[in-house]
Amino acid sequence: MIIDRNVWIVRPLPHGVNRMNEFLDEDIIAIGFPTGKSFENFSSDDLKKILASHGWDEGFKTANLFVKYLNKNDIVVVPDNNKRDIYFGIIDTKYFHKPDKDVPYENLYPHQRKVKWLFDKKPFLRSDLPDEIRGSLRYPGTIANITKHREFIENIINLENTNTTTETSLKSLAVTQLKDLLTSQNEEIRIRAIELVMKHNL
């Protein structure tokens, strides 16, 4: 599903190395694949060929999504590899290439986008998120589209403009947002919200 504003899981693990701290410090999300070239003007076929020439055939989907489908103003949900913390951000730029990170065998991350991290770069707890979102976070790939959860996630990130902080339990926030979803225009979301309210006696 690709619409006007998408929500993406982006894992901070280029070449299997946890770069969550670097992502936060440098205000970025990024992927690896140091080929010595920017992917900006590559067609999908060109991208597939250059990755294959370096033995990264399985990385095509990740690179293609990152370069061609993520967009400025999309929401990113970035789960730290500690399986506890979740960070929220807004993509702030188009794709760009960092030559100084394009070093073979260093497990770096040359293909980047700038991100505005929300909530002063403080994490939410994975355990406080609704079951449906936690289920999506179990997807093992580097990048996944979870726009089906956009309404709920936008309600969370809108807290950035209130006095609410991450010290407030997301469980209590989830109750408020869930009740708001009872009036959603989307019938499937509305029915699911009713089921959850009844299940948890909210």
What kind of feature is each model-predicted range?
Residues K37-P110:
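Structured alpha/beta reader/binder surfaces that contact nucleic acids or chromatin modification marks
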Residues D57-K61, A144, T165-S169, L173, ...:
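Alpha-helix boundary/N-cap detector
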Residues K83-R84, I90-I143:
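Aromatic- and Lys/Arg-enriched surface recognition patch
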Residues P140-T165:
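Long, charge-rich alpha-helical interaction segments
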Residues S172-L202:
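Amphipathic alpha-helical protein-protein interaction segments
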Residues I9, N158-N163, L170, R190-R192:
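Boundary/linker segments flanking structured domains
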Residues G32-K37, L137-I146:
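Short, cationic low-complexity segments
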Residues M1-T62:
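Compositionally biased, charged N-terminal/linker segments
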